[in-house]
Amino acid sequence: MPHQHILMLFGLLPVATNISTWWNFGSMLLTCSALQIMTGFFLAVHYTANINLAFSSIIHNTRDVPHGWMMQNLHAIGASMFFICIYIHMARGLYYGSYLNKETWLSGTTLLIMLMATAFFGYVLPWGQMSFWAATVITNLLTAIPYLGTTMTTWLWGGFAINDPTLTRFFALHFILPFGIISLSSLHIMLLHEEGSSNPLGTNSDIDKIPFHPYHTYKDLFMISSMIMIMLLTISFLPDIFNDPENFFKANLLTTPQHIKPEWYFLFAYGILRSIPNKLGGALALAMSIMILLTVPFTHTANTRSMTFRPFMQLMFWTLMATFIIITWTATKPVEAPYTTISQVASTLYFMFFMSNLILGWLENKIMKTQL
């Protein structure tokens, strides 16, 4: 009986008939979140937040704990799947004008920032060579903040260098932040259902809606099943595809890796940071690469919501997708020509998308009026 009541609530939820597969990534993100929390709990049970024991505890979990290798790989590959889903979810929001539901978009961008922080803290926990040096480089950017930077960095590190207190803090933050993500996700979903989902045409859906259950529940379940299948296949055949070879060595203060880089899902922001040959400028560009998403609802000047009917913005959108991939690629390369030049051009084009939103919207309105 309780299950019938839950399904009845879903049945009462009206959804536009024409929403496509791109609208399924929200439920996939919810599944990823649940999976990460469950696997994270089992990993935390066997983890030791100590610089001398952290790396050994990871090896112990992989070798000696029953199904520990599966939990570890599910958690690591689950994080990559989480970011793949969130980037597609955001791209859909940008393309179809979902950002015009301002509160939902702003809460979603805040969620992205929290998620990136959580993933960064988690990347440091194995205390491998790349974990340690990525943490050193990224946290050191705080020193670029005038007046407060050095104090903030010392507070975050728990001393004058990354050491045992740093690892303890990062573990505590990695454990507590997901609860904030759950709370903010609930708010995000509540704000979304105040107005309802948009649709590919960007029109009002009130005239043509169907119940969420059974139509969209089966569609969601199909996409979730496909995602889990891809994850399990990756874990079975390519478990280390996203891992850096340097991270299979314990952190060593005396040896610097040839090329320090974070996980693949941060490479676009890291590439933007590296494209500016100035510490403060790079740190600001890094922050702006995410923060600029907050401006999108306020720079929309077009009369049409979706990019389906906006050819100029479509061109800019696909340029944005291309620059995202190019910046990610250049960030994996050494800091030398021609990669620095490519990275600088791609970073400029990345920010151009957000700045052109205002002008191109106005231009498209003018063209539409002329045609009429």
From Swiss-Prot:
A ubiquinone binds at residue 193. It is found in: Mitochondrion inner membrane. The keyword Ligase does not apply. Keywords: Electron transport, Heme, Iron, Membrane, Metal-binding, Mitochondrion, Mitochondrion inner membrane, Respiratory chain, Transmembrane, Transmembrane helix, Transport, Ubiquinone. Heme b b566 binds at residues 89, 188. One of its GO terms (molecular function) is metal ion binding. GO terms for biological process: mitochondrial electron transport, ubiquinol to cytochrome c. Binds 2 heme b groups non-covalently. Its main location: mitochondrion. It holds the Pfam family Cytochrom_B_C. It is a multi-pass membrane protein. The keyword RNA-binding does not apply. GO terms for cellular component: mitochondrial inner membrane; respiratory chain complex III. SUPFAM superfamilies: a domain/subunit of cytochrome bc1 complex (Ubiquinol-cytochrome c reductase) (SSF81648), Transmembrane di-heme cytochromes (SSF81342). Its cofactor is heme b. Heme b b562 binds at residues 75, 174. The chain crosses the membrane at residues 25-45, 69-90, 105-125, 170-190, 218-238, 280-300, 312-332, 339-358. The cytochrome bc1 complex contains 3 respiratory subunits (MT-CYB, CYC1 and UQCRFS1), 2 core proteins (UQCRC1 and UQCRC2) and probably 6 low-molecular weight proteins. Component of the ubiquinol-cytochrome c reductase complex (complex III or cytochrome b-c1 complex) that is part of the mitochondrial respiratory chain. The b-c1 complex mediates electron transfer from ubiquinol to cytochrome c. Contributes to the generation of a proton gradient across the mitochondrial membrane that is then used for ATP synthesis. Belongs to the cytochrome b family. Heme 1 (or BL or b562) is low-potential and absorbs at about 562 nm, and heme 2 (or BH or b566) is high-potential and absorbs at about 566 nm. This is Cytochrome b. It comes from Sanzinia madagascariensis (Madagascar tree boa).
